[in-house]
Regions:
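C-terminal amphipathic/interface module of NAD(P)-dependent oxidoreductases
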Residues: 53-121
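Short charge-dense sequence patches
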Residues: 5-12, 82-86
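Short, surface-exposed loop/helix-turn segments at secondary-structure junctions
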Residues: 13-17
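Alpha-helical substrate-binding/gating segment
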Residues: 3-9, 19-40, 48
């Protein structure tokens, strides 16, 4: 199982692709436990998001059919500033990408912080 962003409601633009609603999570776990004769399978724990990045057709073998879609919250999410720094916005890992990131080229900083930082040679 590869779990997406399992939060009550999408709160950032990235969640429009990765959100995993709680009702879909419960259905997914049930299907992962109860499905028979599947063998080895890698599946994404993600709702039926219109903007999803992942091909999750393999989940059909489990009988998993998500019903929730982050798109219902898109207008609200996109009306707010993106809380992720530039690194988090660029990569699939979101806010986790910059944890213990040691490269000092400013890539993990916000544009405002980068403007205040001394430039590197």
């Amino acid at each position: 199982m590869r779990i997406g962003s399992c939060v009550e409601r999408p709160t950032e633009p990235r969640h429009l692709s990765t959100w995993f609603g709680h009702a879909d999570l419960m259905h997914f776990i049930d299907r992962c436990i109860e499905a028979e004769g599947v063998g080895f399978l890698v599946v994404w724990g993600v709702s039926a998001n219109k903007r999803s990045w992942w091909d999750n057709r393999g989940a059909e073998r489990l009988g998993f059919h998500p019903t929730q879609d982050a798109e219902a919250c898109a207008a609200e999410v996109l009306a707010r500033p993106n809380p992720l720094d530039t690194l988090g916005q660029r990569f699939q890992g979101g806010s986790f990408v910059g944890i213990n990131y040691t490269r000092h080229d400013g890539a993990a900083q916000t544009p405002a912080a980068r403007a205040e930082a001394p430039s590197l040679p």
